[in-house]
Amino acid sequence: MVVQAVSESLKFDQSRFLNDIQILSAAINAPYSESTTKKVLSVFSDSFHDGVVLWRATDRVGDALNYRFYSRRPIDTVTIASSAGLLSPDVVSNLGRLVTSWSSLYDGLPEESCDFDAEKGLVKAWVYMRGMRPLGDILSAEGVPESLKQHEERFKALELEKVRHVAVDYQKATVNLYFRAQGPISLQQATSFNALAGAGPPSQTQFLEMQEFLNAVGYTFAVTIRVDSGDIERVGYYALKLPDRATKNWPVINAQLEKFAQFAPSYDREEMNAVAWSFGGTKRYVKFERSYCGELVPLIKGWGTTLSS
């Protein structure tokens, strides 16, 4: 694993972060708890200081402001969170064991990271599989329920066969699978992908934007599955690292995300902005992510991620 050097001025600073998150949450009207945030920063201090940190928000007013660290070294986030009282024993024994199971694949190579809600604290664990891995490996890992396994052939029929990340949402009891989808995207492909979540095809405007910004070689596509029922709640298409807005227009974002773009600071030498179009049933929304500190772009390039610029 190549570890990127990060200059001292660009590293995580807790006081600065607490000031930044308070301003940002107020700007986008997102709930915020300083005490919960301080607890999170204490429990995962090493990961925030040594890893990469980013922001995430949606275009829906009142939605959470999220932040995430990507660890640069293997850690056991489930044990750390459990020991600190951030996860209940029931969550650890069910959803937590999925995280641990996936992390143990490939002789323990996968790396865990976490998502946090500015008000609620820890909400999600990520597992980077350290490469593009066969879907069958992911779904045959110990403890993976039939509710997830049942979709294997359907995914393969859509040529969704390689997984780079998985994520487990502790709050919503869902699992995300992040695939490399074959590009360039077509309307037929998007229609078939959306149908997984019971959604109609993207609008013409949405599709043209997706076609413009999703990498033509291949792009990140995610499905969100309820662990109990196996229902696919939504799908998402990720345009990672948008071009500099001064040189090329971004996809259309609403006033809520314009506020986020205005107030979310980034201290990385090369800023990373990303949008994701999400579809589930009749619901559609847009997510926006921005690098905060720790040098996100070199990290995701090291993963072999296809980018928009």
UniProtKB/Swiss-Prot annotation:
Pfam families in the record: PTase_Orf2
Protein family per UniProt: Belongs to the aromatic prenyltransferase family.
Molecular function GO labels: prenyltransferase activity
InterPro entries: Aro_prenylTrfase, Prenyltransferase_CloQ, PrenylTrfase-like_sf
Stated name of the protein: Aromatic prenyltransferase
Species this chain originates from: Botryotinia fuckeliana (strain B05.10) (Noble rot fungus)
Keyword presence, Transferase: yes
Additional observations: The gene is not located within a recognizable secondary metabolic gene cluster.
